[in-house]
Amino acid sequence: GDDVKSACCDTCLCTKSEPPTCRCVDVGERCHSACNSCVCRYSNPPKCQCFDTHKFCYKSCHN
C-alpha cells in the first residue's frame, strides 16, 4: 500500500549474500511508515530504529 510507497531510508545496510538481507539503520523520532518491528529508546526526542529485514532498500529520504 501507500505505507511502502512512502517509506524511505537514508542508511541501508545489506549482507553480501544472495539474495541480500537489508536493514534500514536510520535513527529518528519514529520509524518509517512500512516498519513492522520498531524499537524506540526513551529519550527526548525519542530515538527509534526499525529492525525489519528485506531483500531490498527503500529509496533515500533526502535526495
Curated annotation (Swiss-Prot):
Residues of the site described as Reactive bond for chymotrypsin: Y42, S43
PROSITE patterns named in the record: BOWMAN_BIRK
Top-level taxon: Eukaryota
GO MF terms, alphabetically ordered: serine-type endopeptidase inhibitor activity
Positions marked as site (Reactive bond for trypsin): K16, S17
Keyword terms: Disulfide bond, Protease inhibitor, Serine protease inhibitor
A GO cellular component entry from the record: extracellular region
Cystine residue pairs: C8-C61, C9-C24, C12-C57, C14-C22, C31-C38, C35-C50, C40-C48
Xref: InterPro entries: Bowman-Birk_prot_inh, Prot_inh_BBI
Function: This inhibitor has two domains, each with separate antiprotease activity. Inhibits bovine trypsin and chymotrypsin, in a molar ratio of 1:1. The trypsin inhibition of FBI is independent of chymotrypsin inhibition, but the chymotrypsin inhibition is not completely independent of trypsin inhibition.
Family: Belongs to the Bowman-Birk serine protease inhibitor family.
Record protein name field: Bowman-Birk type proteinase inhibitor
Organism: Vicia faba (Broad bean)
